[in-house]
Regions:
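Conserved catalytic core of the tyrosine transesterase superfamily
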Residues: 1-226
């Protein structure tokens, strides 16, 4: 048979090797505490900044979910917060006592500012964290900048810190504390538990580090050091 060029590409249907999923970067509890302390000591918008950070670490929300929260979700000293996630799916996330306290304190100041704005003819904002920008609420980019400022003030490497690393820290610390994957999946709003399972690998790596650092038999003997 005479050889000719094929009209189609026979390899187009062949799938290439999949990329290995990178483990999410996270923070330890000491680093999270430093970030929270830095927010509490903010020179401007201290109550708002404290509320943002406490809610983020207490719930593991995505940054867009956090900054766009409606103020109605925060009324009545809630023990659970209704969050609207990807695809408009709603979920309830529990609030820790520090997060509830930070939220209550912030609402007092926020409502006072809103009352003053209304007296000047401005409409009330439906958002928990209002802004004069086009969206009407604090942008994710502004919060990204804020969290970097908290990192610098708290002595944590800014390269390690993003709103998403706080979400990772929330999940990893819960898992280390004994929470089950299904509960963490629900709180994070993951559609598939396989997405949540990656945190078990993060925890495995952290446990290995702790063993190598603290276990007496993991340290080199005197003869090995010589």
């Amino acid at each position: 048979f005479e050889e000719t060029w094929r009209a189609d590409n026979p390899v187009i249907q062949i799938k290439g090797p999949g990329r290995a999923k990178r483990l999410p970067k996270t923070l330890d509890i000491v680093e999270v505490d430093r970030l929270l302390d830095a927010a509490r000591q903010s020179k401007r918008d201290r109550l708002r900044n404290t509320c943002l950070m406490e809610l983020l670490y207490a719930t593991g929300m995505r940054v867009t979910e956090l900054v766009s929260l409606p103020v109605s979700a925060a009324r009545g000293d809630p023990r659970m917060l209704l969050v609207r996630g990807k695809g408009g799916k709603e979920r309830l996330v529990p609030l820790s006592p520090p997060a509830r306290a930070a939220l209550a304190a912030y609402l007092v100041g926020r409502d006072a500012a809103e009352d003053a704005a209304r007296k000047n003819g401005n409409a009330a904002s439906p958002f928990l964290f209002p802004s004069r920008g086009k969206l009407g609420y604090l942008t994710r980019h502004r919060f990204f900048g804020l969290i970097k400022e908290f990192a610098v003030a708290g002595g944590v490497s800014p390269a390690k810190v993003t709103p998403h690393t706080l979400r990772h820290a929330f999940a990893t610390h819960l898992l280390a504390g004994g929470a089950d994957l299904m509960s963490i999946q629900t709180m994070l709003g993951h559609a598939d538990v396989a997405t949540t399972e990656i945190y078990t690998h993060v925890l495995d790596d952290r446990l290995k580090e702790l063993v190598l650092e603290h276990h007496p038999l993991a340290k080199p003997s005197k003869t090995e050091r010589q």
